A protein has these predicted regions:
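Active-site-proximal alpha-helix that buttresses catalytic centers in soluble enzyme cores
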Residues: 5-7, 11-72
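Phosphate-handling substructures
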Residues: 68-127
Length: 190
């Protein structure tokens, strides 16, 4: 069996302010660095054999905290980057809802809004999910892989791995900053 640990990055100032980050390359704040240190202690105890990360700074910095105690290097996987939120990046949800109430309602219901440059849910789910599937497929029988990514990317990627419709199902709710989830492959025949 292969363990795949999906780990969301630590807190940033945008998280603290309730701003949508998307592809904006925001660093961890002091709280985020402390969250990463504490979570890394727990994850290191699970015996990781490989660390992969989104190229965005907040994910890379979180992954690097785990690299030190494990002696592993961090491999950058571009497909693990956060979903693009287009024109809404840097804005607060309340401001978006006020300025575009109908579009906001569509987005909250799982609809896509390409007119704002927002990456579609299915597109994100497939991009991240297929990257995670390929990473797990390349793993050895007893490998423990840590994949450091982002809230929407992780949720949608997990939805894809589980074969669920990302337009109808909203993934791992409540995966706060620096929380992680364990998925286990089962490569044995049925």
């Amino acid at each position: 069996m292969t363990d795949l640990i999906l780990w969301r990055h630590g807190q940033t100032d945008y998280n603290l302010q309730g701003r949508i980050q998307g592809r904006v390359d925001i660093p961890l704040n002091d709280t985020g660095r402390e969250q990463a240190r504490r979570a890394a202690d727990c994850i290191a105890a699970l015996g990781p054999t490989r660390i992969v990360s989104s190229p965005l700074l907040r994910a890379r910095a979180t992954a690097e905290v785990l690299a030190s105690p494990t002696g592993l290097s961090v491999e950058i996987v571009p497909e693990l980057a956060e979903k693009s939120f287009g024109q809404w990046e840097g804005l607060k949800a309340a401001d978006i809802e006020k300025q575009w109430p109908d579009h906001y309602a569509t987005w909250r219901a799982g609809g896509d809004l390409p007119q704002f440059g927002i990456e579609g849910r299915r597109q994100t789910a497939q991009r991240v999910g297929e990257a995670l599937r390929a990473i797990a497929a390349d793993a050895g029988k007893d490998d423990v892989i840590v994949a450091v990514s982002h809230g929407a990317a992780t949720n949608l990627g997990a939805t894809h791995l589980l074969g669920m419709d990302p337009q109808q199902w909203f993934g791992l709710r409540g995966m706060s900053n620096c929380c992680y989830a364990l998925m286990r492959t089962n490569k044995r025949p049925p």
